[in-house]
Amino acid sequence: MTGGKESSGPGTQLAFPGWGAPSREALRWERPGLRLALWPGWLHTTPLHVADLMEHLRRAIPWRQPEVTVYGRRHPVPRLTCWLGDAGCAYRYSGLVECPHPWTEPLSQVRDRLEAHLGVGFNCLLLNRYRDGRDRMGWHADDEPELVADHPIASLSLGASRTLRFRPRPGGAPAEGDPPEPLSVELADGDLLLMAAPTQRYWQHGLPSRLGVKSERFNLTFRAVQPGMEPQPQL
């Protein structure tokens, strides 16, 4: 893990305004406009079995590879995705409209554990499946109008290790002088990363390809959207 991390001291609770303080020790990054917390191997500290959860993700999730429009041309996204959530929690991003699939029992159990750990609620889940190191995600910020403003996003990693990169958004983070340096965070199997406000307003993140990686990675990003928009289900 790189980028000048700061570790909370023994017994220190990592608290942000507006939501509960997790009890376990975390690594944290705080820069102008950016707040991150990382619990290495968090999933392995729970009663949930990672191998069983990964097999569930492979077999029970209706994965698809959507297309996005870039400069007037359609391109498949370089990964597989699926959107789960409570009724009415649809989501628009990159020109796509995602109608939620219902929660599965194993993923509902993960949500329950996560909410108990963080003291904050989530009503939807974006799943990304990176089949190997060629799959990736470009620079973006999760700032769509459907998302509850300034609500934290929790990202859970399973499988292969990959590097999540952060950079100030065009226009700069709220700081005087030179913009903050980019940041890289290595995410391993079972790691839990929390992106707290105002990170999405001032920073972008992306997952570059890593051609040496031959195995798959699942990323579970728990979010909160404002219910109500209910487009037609995808066929």
Regions found by a protein language model. Name each.
Residues 1-235:
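Non-heme Fe(II) oxygenase metal-center motifs and adjacent flexible, charged/small-residue loops
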